[in-house]
């Protein structure tokens, strides 16, 4: 289940996470990863066939007609380049929706002027609403597999804010 840590090291309670999420229109839910995907998700990298298998095992969401699977792993040649890109603070015109299937990551958000880190792992489903400044960082393991949902193609474009990572 997702955890929220503030810059001062304090961990938010479940009630605080719910209140903060509601106030900032962030959705944080737990949606179990289908057990049938365990063997496929255990692979470090996935080819197109394996990625399609993963996507086919998850129910489509009509409100998000487009989706793909992002796989970051140390064995991926451009892993650090992609990870660094996501670390830059940015916002989107559309919602950023992720369902974490394997690995872990950290969504940084600004909550009432204070930076907070939302740690996500397998089964966590998060929606960062359009316009909310955020970033994303990998954990020390440097790996994650997540479905990215999109309601419109323009939503993928990031507007970088220049805030220091």
Swiss-Prot record:
> One Pfam family for this entry, by name?
ARD
Q: Which reaction does it catalyse?
A: 1,2-dihydroxy-5-(methylsulfanyl)pent-1-en-3-one + O2 = 3-(methylsulfanyl)propanoate + CO + formate + 2 H(+); 1,2-dihydroxy-5-(methylsulfanyl)pent-1-en-3-one + O2 = 4-methylsulfanyl-2-oxobutanoate + formate + 2 H(+)
Q: What class of enzyme is it?
A: oxidoreductase
Q: Which family does it belong to?
A: Belongs to the acireductone dioxygenase (ARD) family.
The organism's place on the tree of life at top rank: Bacteria
What is the role of this chain? Catalyzes 2 different reactions between oxygen and the acireductone 1,2-dihydroxy-3-keto-5-methylthiopentene (DHK-MTPene) depending upon the metal bound in the active site. Fe-containing acireductone dioxygenase (Fe-ARD) produces formate and 2-keto-4-methylthiobutyrate (KMTB), the alpha-ketoacid precursor of methionine in the methionine recycle pathway. Ni-containing acireductone dioxygenase (Ni-ARD) produces methylthiopropionate, carbon monoxide and formate, and does not lie on the methionine recycle pathway.
Cofactor: how and how many bound: Binds 1 Fe(2+) cation per monomer. Binds 1 nickel ion per monomer.
Q: Does Amino-acid biosynthesis appear among the keywords?
A: yes
The family database entries (InterPro entries) matched by this protein are listed as: ARD, ARD_bac, RmlC-like_jellyroll, RmlC_Cupin_sf
Kindly list the GO molecular function terms attached to this UniProt entry.
acireductone dioxygenase (Ni2+-requiring) activity; acireductone dioxygenase [iron(II)-requiring] activity; iron ion binding; nickel cation binding
Instruction: Show which residues form the site (Important to generate the dianion).
Output: 98
Q: Which residues bind Fe(2+)?
A: 90, 92, 96, 134
List the Gene3D superfamilies hit by this protein, alphabetically. Jelly Rolls
Asked if the record carries the keyword Acyltransferase, the reply is no
Q: What is its quaternary makeup?
A: Monomer.
Name one process (GO BP) from the record: L-methionine salvage from S-adenosylmethionine
Enumerate the residues binding Ni(2+). 90, 92, 96, 134
- Record-linked SUPFAM superfamilies: RmlC-like cupins
- What pathway is this protein said to act in by its record? Amino-acid biosynthesis; L-methionine biosynthesis via salvage pathway; L-methionine from S-methyl-5-thio-alpha-D-ribose 1-phosphate: step 5/6
Q: Which UniProt keywords apply?
A: Amino-acid biosynthesis, Dioxygenase, Iron, Metal-binding, Methionine biosynthesis, Nickel, Oxidoreductase
Identify the residue position(s) of the site May play a role in transmitting local conformational changes: 95
> Would you tell me the protein name for this molecule?
Acireductone dioxygenase
EC number(s) reported in the record: 1.13.11.54, 1.13.11.53
The cofactors named for this UniProt entry are: Fe(2+); Ni(2+)
